[in-house]
Amino acid sequence: MMISTAYQSLFLTALFSAISIAVGNVYQTLNVIGDRNVTIPTNGIPQRLSVYDPYRGVNCQGYQAVNISESQNGVTAYLALLGEPCYAYGTDYPLLFLNVTYEEADRVHISIKDANNTQFQFTSRKDLWDAPLYSPSYNNTNLLYNFSYNANPFEFWVTRKSDGEVLFDTRGQKLVFEDQYIELTTNMVENYNLYGLAETIHGLRLGNNLTRTFWANDEPSPVDQNMYGSHPYYLEQRYKADGINSTLNETTYTSSSHGVLMLTANGMDVLLRQDYLQYRMIGGVIDLFVYSGSTESPKETVKQFVQSIGKPAMHQYWTLGYHSCRWGYTNITEIMDVRQNYIDADIPVETFWSDIDYMEKYRDFTVDPVSYSKSDMQTFFSDLVSNHQHYVPIIDAAIYAANPYNHTDDSYYPYYAGVEKDIFLKNPNGSIYIGAVWPGFTAFPDFTNPDVVDYWKDCLINLTYAFGSNGTVPFSGIWTDMNEPSSFCVGSCGSAMIDLNPAEPLTGISKQYSIPEGFNVSNVTEYSSAYSASLSNYYATATSSVFQIVSPTATPLGLKPDYNIDWPPYAINNEQGNHDIANHIVSPNATTHDGTQRYDIFNMYGYGETKVSYAALTQISPNERPFILSRSTFLGSGVYGAHWLGDNHSLWSNMFFSISGMIVFNMMGIPMVGADVCGFLGDSDEELCSRWMAMGAFSPFYRNHNNIYQISQEPYTWSSVAEASRRAMYIRYSLLPYWYTIMAKASQDGTPALRALFVEFPNDPTLADVDRQFMVGDSLLVTPVLEPNVEYVQGVFPGDNSTVWYDWYNHTEIVRQYNENVTLYAPLEHINVAIRGGSVLPMQQPSLTTYESRQNPFNLLVALDRDGSATGELYLDDGVSIELNATLSVSFTFSDGVLSAVPTGSYEVSQPLANVTILGLTESPSSITLNGQNVSSFQYSNDTEELLITGLQNITSSGAFANSWNLTL
């Protein structure tokens, strides 16, 4: 959720004046960096240099390696500064310490820090971030890489042994290591293919003219700018010509991929340029990890990285259903009506979500006693439980700062308990840091505090009572928002002003007047209906807002000698005005319980909240997998939660960009990811929402979410959207066993569930930047329509002529030529889906909820390759528990006319197998048996080369996979 652009203009002037006053006072006491004077304009803001200014490091000479020691485990050395300090953007350290560790056969860690350990060292703080990467096996007897270096000047490079590829190469580049500026540069191959460096709005392939900034930022969908999360890892894919395919007269290629991680939570720019990539960090040390990757598949490279930061959580089965949400439901009755509308429209819906509307005056862990009364909520929850549906409320990061002089605030437990337990972030002087968010002046939990889990657990338990549930948990997960954490003022603006609370919530939120590109206004009837429905949405108003009483001064900054926190001399390319790193965010000078400044761990606040929420929820509901959807993420967030792509717009471009966003987050180890379907900001329209609802059915996390005052966009609002949704959801719910299997695979070893085409077909360089199509697992290729007013879409179907693709709907082979686009018919209510030959897809007959679908018989869809073979797998468990008493894995193979199923594990599935469909079968069988029993019910189509076998329930009445079986044609 964001503050509207229109309303920002009402208070930004006052806030910028606060910046000027505060920073001006600070810089009068700090005007020297090294031996250079800093120019201070009259407004008090120091003149700083960014990536767009002339580079200051041209005179830096780098370092020389001395006292070098090599061992089986790695290399250590001291690095002595060459020449005079260059003072590029700070004070140069004269002596550094190098520690190269061969941590795994496929991973090397290059650590460079100042010799006196002055700089903050992220890897020394396992209390902040603990990952498998911190527990290496030191299996260095069969290293897959070589680490090489030159001593004077010091430079290093990492190569892959098997093919000699140079993976990271600083030769010819100078290392710069200053107190608030660290620079490391690697040479890049020509026209390199880079993916990752999340989170940003960009196409899949990053290109070589881009600056990626890492600084958590509350801004809705800014293209090529920093956003909510920080994942400073990239995967590079390379291609090599190795011959000619005589049949196709085409060059053939081999490929390789590798990964690079710069482990830091500090602010950073990463410059992608034509022949180099450069890191520019404003603090910390260098902790570089190079992954040797794979010469076979980028999936292996992704797995190396994900397994090092922590394998993703396995979410409950129900999370794969469809989720309905909007900001602006006036009361619980409206949500009840929405639920009934879904039923009437025969559209599946799994979960209903509440935005901040349900809260009392937008205060966390409260419930509006009138609009969301306990009795009404209990009726609502009872209906959900009886229909196997779910509820998820939002929880913002900021806690309302109760006014000690206002007795109506006396009962606000989250604040007073936080004060008593000393939970909140502090100012440098030790007072509580007070910002401003929806409820007024707010404090912010310190999620690194060892006592915060108990505090957060108690707050969540209190929320269950506020819902009238007497301690039972009525919600199935939580939605953590605004957790960069966002703040609507600069600095600790409310430190001396809590007595003005309750400052009423915002009064200036307004409708976002934007409509999708290519909007067709001819269909005014349904548009008017949707708009009218939106008018019933209510937003609380009041006579004053927190922004009208924001203090014109900010708390003085806490500074180390010659160390500037809020205005470092190098300005990373932060999206906020003047690259201000303290704007619209909790200031980097805020400190944790042990005095650590946010400046050094800035990008991991959302990660901390997700981790703490996971721990708290597991204490409340032991052995039940928590579901936490977080806006801000960091390396390893997927271990504990899911992610949505934030406050997008109802634009075709945002629908397109969401494909790359989902693919990249799967590479980052967060497979449960999706966008706000139909868009959050601005009015959607019938065509865009129809296309997006269809595409969303093939995203791991599938939720329609809408902004306050925008027209309604629930799928039943328009007839065509309702029909498109039903069709796409029928496919999704049919494929729930397949979805659960690929999500389990992601949790088990890091294999991405949603994939770019180049990941699945790595030896085709033409796929390197294909981002208008995507793969779901190994077997499904989705080709959505991403522009208005069209009935056709083009897509590529990868693989050589031995590869087969089948149309999902008519089961016929798609006629294609190697490396050429195919034009596909795509009427408004249709999304093109193709099945890859060689696949066995486990399915179940769909119902309106995931629970009901799980009770239905199984089906198998077998799509044969050119050799008449296929393989597949199925994974099932109880869909709920963390510690599992039983699981079931089934391996499917089809070869020489026999379909085999081999189950392992003790989880019992009582549902029978109903049907088997086989595609690409060139002739009809004369007879069919299942474990020797005759099967008489089957049909074969010569036109489609499709065999449909039905009536298997009686033979498999004890369970589809209770035993191994062979289906023989």
Swiss-Prot record:
Q: What is its main location?
A: secreted
| Annotated signal sequence range | 1-24
GO cellular-component term (any): extracellular region
EC numbers: 3.2.1.20
Task: Give the enzyme's main class according to its UniProt record, as a single word.
Answer: hydrolase
* Outcome of substituting E714Q: No loss of activity
Q: What is the effect of changing D676N?
A: No loss of activity
Q: Which UniProt keywords apply?
A: Glycoprotein, Glycosidase, Hydrolase, Secreted, Signal
> What PROSITE patterns does this protein's entry cite?
GLYCOSYL_HYDROL_F31_1, GLYCOSYL_HYDROL_F31_2
Q: Where does it live in the cell?
A: Secreted
What is the stated purpose of this protein?
Answer: Hydrolyzes malto-oligosaccharides, but has a low activity toward soluble starch.
| Protein's UniProt name | Alpha-glucosidase
Q: Which species?
A: Schizosaccharomyces pombe (strain 972 / ATCC 24843) (Fission yeast)
